UniProtKB/Swiss-Prot annotation:
It is found in: Cytoplasm; Nucleus; Chromosome, Centromere; Cytoplasm, Cytoskeleton, Spindle pole. This is Serine/threonine-protein phosphatase 2A catalytic subunit beta isoform. PP2A consists of a common heterodimeric core enzyme (composed of a 36 kDa catalytic subunit (subunit C) and a 65 kDa constant regulatory subunit (PR65) (subunit A)) that associates with a variety of regulatory subunits. Proteins that associate with the core dimer include three families of regulatory subunits B (the R2/B/PR55/B55, R3/B''/PR72/PR130/PR59 and R5/B'/B56 families), the 48 kDa variable regulatory subunit, viral proteins, and cell signaling molecules. Binds PPME1. May indirectly interact with SGO1, most probably through regulatory B56 subunits. Interacts with CTTNBP2NL. It catalyses: O-phospho-L-seryl-[protein] + H2O = L-seryl-[protein] + phosphate; O-phospho-L-threonyl-[protein] + H2O = L-threonyl-[protein] + phosphate. Its EC number is 3.1.3.16. The active site is at residue 118. It holds the Pfam family Metallophos. The modification Leucine methyl ester is found at residue 309. Its cofactor is Mn(2+).
């Protein structure tokens, strides 16, 4: 099929997915093959230009992803950078990840999708995506297409050379962005080592490196963040991976920000979600939002910008 015909078909898929209707197995296979062709050209430290809107964990909460797009602007009108964890825990992992991948294939320059610790064969077999694929398709093929694709997702992104974005955090094995560029990412997320750390680590109030309670990655203190940012000419590390009740949370004297974009996480945590808008001068503002109204609930959205210089 020629490019023009495929683009037309892709637009129909996006339209269908926007209504939370899954694609069929063959369509998913085609989509994942096209996505691999695009992602294989992307770097472990993918360069992104502002303006861009940075988002944290989504975790299969499809209707809340729709709310995110309502508040932040539709793709491709708004440039997006998602920091991983598209699947597991929510009820619509299939539709959520398929839509994000379809948008990536349709508008490769307008959306960047990074790998989270849940974009893994092992984790998805425990936390819901595998079972959901089985339930919705009757076999594990779609799960296999996506988990094979996950190996191609970039690990980190760099916005205008200054804001470093990734799912988890820093690694004792990594001092510079060049160390990250040199990693071989085309594999299942390892149990330990630098690639694992980037997807699993968390900032901590204690200085230095610590053992992570998660059983993978490390905790890292403000001294580590400051040293890393200074050595690499960065102004900020932006990451996701942790539930924060306001949707975003500064730490390490504003060297690190956590962004979490799944409101009322697991449909019971009661948290707000947030996204971070970076304008063309890299000034940031956070937009917070509540869960999408479910059917029968009054439609109220909360758009509350907080501006910081």
């Amino acid at each position: 099929m020629d490019d023009k015909a495929f683009t037309k078909e892709l637009d129909q898929w996006v339209e269908q997915l926007n209504e939370c209707k899954q694609l069929n197995e063959n369509q998913v296979r085609t989509l994942c093959e096209k996505a691999k062709e695009i992602l294989t050209k992307e770097s472990n430290v993918q360069e992104v230009r502002c303006p861009v809107t940075v988002c944290g964990d989504v975790h299969g909460q499809f209707h809340d992803l729709m709310e995110l797009f309502r508040i932040g602007g539709k793709s491709p009108d708004t440039n997006y950078l998602f920091m991983g964890d598209y699947v597991d825990r929510g009820y619509y992992s299939v539709e959520t990840v398929t839509l994000l991948v379809a948008l990536k294939v349709r508008y490769p320059e307008r959306i960047t999708i990074l790998r989270g610790n849940h974009e893994s064969r092992q984790i998805t077999q425990v936390y819901g995506f595998y079972d959901e694929c089985l339930r919705k398709y009757g076999n594990a093929n779609v799960w296999k297409y996506f988990t094979d694709l996950f190996d191609y997702l970039p690990l980190t992104a760099l916005v205008d050379g200054q804001i470093f974005c990734l799912h988890g955090g820093l690694s004792p094995s990594i001092d510079t962005l060049d160390h990250i560029r040199a990693l071989d990412r085309l594999q299942e997320v390892p149990h330990e080592g630098p690639m694992c750390d980037l997807l699993w680590s968390d900032p901590d109030d204690r200085g230095g490196w610590g053992i992570s309670p998660r059983g993978a990655g490390y905790t890292f203190g403000q001294d580590i963040s400051e040293t890393f940012n200074h050595a690499n000419g960065l102004t900020l590390v932006s990451r996701a991976h942790q539930l924060v009740m306001e949707g975003y949370n500064w730490c390490h004297d504003r060297n690190v920000v956590t962004i979490f974009s799944a409101p009322n996480y697991c449909y019971r945590c009661g948290n707000q979600a947030a996204i971070m808008e970076l304008d063309d001068t890299l000034k940031y503002s956070f937009l917070q939002f509540d869960p999408a109204p479910r059917r029968g609930e009054p439609h109220v959205t909360r758009r509350t910008p907080d501006y910081f210089l």
